[in-house]
Amino acid sequence: MNVSFAPLFLVTLILLGVVSNNNSITISATILLLMQQTALIQFVPLVEKHGLNLGIILLTIGVLSPLVSGKAQVPPVAEFLNFKMISAVFIGIFVAWLAGRGVPLMGQQPVLITGLLIGTVIGVAFMGGIPVGPLIAAGILSFVVGKG
């Protein structure tokens, strides 16, 4: 008997999202549960293939939108030479590199995704994190278990 625990897992995520007042988990898990339980299941492979990229695009739009609205200004070149700005640039490079290591690891060892997701959910639900953690977590994990 082949039983899928995905619906139970999604309901658990929905409950965790409600209890922790985390709309991103609640909405995401609800949409996936509705897709899984209806004819929308046919679009799950499309979400699986393109969802991460679309999510990163939306996140980037959200981060850049204050520049467009005028709420944030592009700093003058001279400000790029202070310690905080230089640190921000190097940390941004490092985190992007970590995420770049994480994506191949998730593809090569997909069983690790479950652990990364559980850790991310706990971090989002109970520690005030945001669900961008799996990529960075996979990048850090690549140092522990080896890349690929």
Swiss-Prot record:
Source organism, top-level taxon: Bacteria
UniProt keyword terms in alphabetical order: Cell membrane, Membrane, Transmembrane, Transmembrane helix
GO cellular component, one term: plasma membrane
UniProt xrefs under InterPro entries: UPF0756_TM
Pfam families cross-referenced by the UniProt entry: DUF441
Recorded topology in the membrane: Multi-pass membrane protein
Location within or outside the cell: Cell membrane
Ranges annotated as spanning the membrane: 13-35, 50-70, 80-100, 121-141
Family to which this protein belongs: Belongs to the UPF0756 family.
HAMAP family according to UniProt: UPF0756 (MF_01874)
Name of the protein this chain belongs to: UPF0756 membrane protein NMCC_1816
